[in-house]
């Protein structure tokens, strides 16, 4: 343990916090700093040139990362009839309607993503105070309220991540695990940045991508030279 702490301390001293590193170097440094006993997540923070106080400059959506996120995602679906069977066939872990709502009210929430068909929102709407604070409330903007229940389930299972600007105009998102290769992490990062570019508000002026940094769960943050990401 002492050797790990010493190694991490040396790595932190090696990183220049004021420097923008080429993306491959930045990701390698972050991987090297992930010395915890578990497979740490690799996260990105993107400072966007938006005014988060204005509703028309909110950046929110979802993207399927090509290399996944390195974890098994449990999906719960609110649907009935044919859609319920389609959800099961697509790989949903939990499918229900009023019974699923009752389970959630009772505290049974063994899932990571909640999907609902549009007609189910009359039931799901009653769960806002439970699902909302946990970031689980279905929303059409991120594809979790959809008539295409098969596509929604498959996207969630394939490693879809949701993104949303916080009060400071920053998007925080996981792009993989420390066990991922640098190439796979870069591919996921590029997919996220492409999605953010497509979601750029028309009212956003000036520089859109202001700053980009990557970090691991327990490690250090490293700033990335944005010009190197597309290289």
Swiss-Prot record:
A GO term from the CC aspect: cytosolic large ribosomal subunit
Gene Ontology terms, MF aspect: rRNA binding; structural constituent of ribosome; tRNA binding
GO biological process: regulation of translation; translation
Statement: the UniProt record of this protein carries the keyword Cell membrane: no
Keywords: Repressor, Ribonucleoprotein, Ribosomal protein, RNA-binding, rRNA-binding, Translation regulation, tRNA-binding
UniProt superkingdom: Bacteria
Pfam family, one: Ribosomal_L1
PROSITE patterns from the UniProt entry: RIBOSOMAL_L1
CDD domains to which the protein is assigned, alphabetical: Ribosomal_L1
Record-linked SUPFAM superfamilies: Ribosomal protein L1 (SSF56808)
Functional description taken from the UniProt entry: Binds directly to 23S rRNA. The L1 stalk is quite mobile in the ribosome, and is involved in E site tRNA release.
Family note: Belongs to the universal ribosomal protein uL1 family.
Quaternary organization: Part of the 50S ribosomal subunit.
NCBIfam families in the record: rplA_bact
The protein's name: Large ribosomal subunit protein uL1
Organism name: Thiobacillus denitrificans (strain ATCC 25259 / T1)
């Amino acid at each position: 343990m002492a050797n790990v702490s010493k190694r991490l301390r040396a790595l932190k001293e090696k990183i220049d916090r004021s420097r923008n590193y080429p993306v491959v170097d930045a990701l390698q440094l972050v991987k090297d700093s992930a010395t915890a006993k578990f497979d740490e997540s690799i996260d990105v923070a993107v400072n966007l040139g938006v005014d988060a106080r204005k509703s028309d400059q909110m950046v929110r959506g979802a993207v399927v990362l090509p290399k996944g996120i390195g974890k098994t995602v449990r999906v719960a679906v609110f649907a009935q009839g044919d859609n319920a069977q389609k959800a099961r066939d697509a790989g949903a872990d939990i499918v229900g309607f009023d019974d699923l709502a009752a389970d959630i009210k009772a505290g049974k929430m063994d899932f990571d993503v909640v999907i609902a068909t549009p007609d189910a929102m009359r039931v799901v709407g009653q769960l806002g105070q439970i699902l909302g604070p946990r970031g689980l409330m279905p929303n059409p903007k991120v594809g979790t309220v959809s008539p295409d229940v098969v596509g929604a389930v498959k996207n969630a299972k394939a490693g879809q991540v949701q993104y949303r600007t916080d009060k400071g105009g920053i998007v925080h998102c996981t792009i993989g695990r420390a066990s991922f290769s640098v190439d796979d992490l870069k591919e996921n990062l590029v997919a996220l940045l492409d999605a953010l570019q497509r979601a750029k508000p028309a009212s956003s002026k000036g520089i859109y991508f202001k700053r980009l940094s990557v970090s691991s769960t327990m490690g250090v943050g490293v700033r990335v030279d944005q010009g190197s990401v597309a290289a």
